[in-house]
Amino acid sequence: MKKRTLRLAFLMLAPALGLSQTQNTGQPPAWQMSWDQIRTVVGKVRAGKDLTPKPWPGGNRVAVAISFDVDNETTSLRDGNTSPSELSQGEYGSRTAMPRILALLDRHGIKATFFVPAVTAKLYPETIRQIVARGHEIGMHGWIHERNSQLTESQERDLMRKSYDTLREISGTRPVGIRTPSWDYSPWTMKIIREMKLLYDSSLMADERPYEVLYEGKPTGVVELPVEWIMDDYPYFGMNRFSTIRPHIGPEDVLDLWRKEFDVAYDESSLFVLTTHPHIIGHRSRIVILDKLIAYMKSRQGVWFARHDEVARAAAAQLRK
C-alpha cells in the first residue's frame, strides 16, 4: 500500500513539478529525429568522472548535505497566481517555517544550504541575513523560479546574472553553486554556469555520487551534487487545490524511505543529498520527521554533515587526482 501511495503522489504531481512541460529545445518530435540529432541531444550534458572522496574530510564515511529551496511565493507568482490565499502559503515559509528550521539546525549543530530565488531574497532580506549569520550557505535558485527550458539563451543568462547580483548584495556572500528552479535545464544552462565560473550545480540526476559534468562531451570542472525526486519533500506533501485528486502521504512513510536511502548511502560510503522546502517541511507534523532523520543519521559513526559548497570543494579536489 505504501509503494502504491507514493507512486500515485508522483503521477498526480507531475504537471506541478513541470515534468510534462514542453521543452524549448527547437528539436522536432522525437519520432522525427535522426540518429545524429538523438545523439546530440542525449550527449549535451552527461555525467563524467566520479568525484567521491575516499574517505570524506575528517576520515568520515558518508557526506550528508541537507538543503532548503526557499521558494515561498515565487512559484505562484511565476504562474500568474496572485490570489492572497495562494501567496499566504509562501509567506508561511518565511514567517513560521524558517524560525523552526533554523532552530532545528542550531539544536543539532549542523550547517545547511539554502537555495533562494532572488525575488524571495528581495521580499525577505532579513531572513537571508539570519541564514548567513548562522553560518549556512546561500545558493542560486533562479530569479522568480522560472522554467529555464521555456527561456531563450539570452533571457536565461540575464536572469541568472541578475539573480547572482541580487543574492550577493543582500546576503553579503558570493554564491558558488546553483540549483535550477524545478531542476529544469535548457540546452545552454550548463554553458551559462561555466561562464559564471560556479563551483557546482545541484539539479541533475545521473548518479547519487558527486560527479564532474560533461558538456558536449568535454569535462567542465563543474561538480554535480545529484538530486532525485524521491529525495524531495514536494512530491509527497505538495498539493494543488484545483486538482481533483489531492495526495497526502503520512510523514512517517516518507521518513522510512529517507532512512533507507541514507542506509545505502552509508553502506556505499557515498553522498546523501536531501531537498526540502520551508513552506512544506516546516509544518508541525513534517518538521518532526526532519528532526528524527537528522538524529538517526547522527547516531551513526563517520557521518559528515556539510554545506553543499563544502561537499563540492571536497569533490572538486578529486579532479586533480
Language-model features: locations:
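Metal-dependent polysaccharide deacetylase catalytic core of the NodB/CE4 family, i.e.
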Residues: P99-L102, D106-S186, T220, P226-S243, ...
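C-terminal domain-boundary segment and adjacent tail
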Residues: R107, Y200, E212, E252-K321
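Boundary at the C-terminal end of the N-terminal hydrophobic targeting segment
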Residues: S20-T22
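Generic enzyme active-site microenvironment
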Residues: S67, G139, F305-H308
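Bacterial N-terminal signal peptides that target proteins for export
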Residues: M1-A9
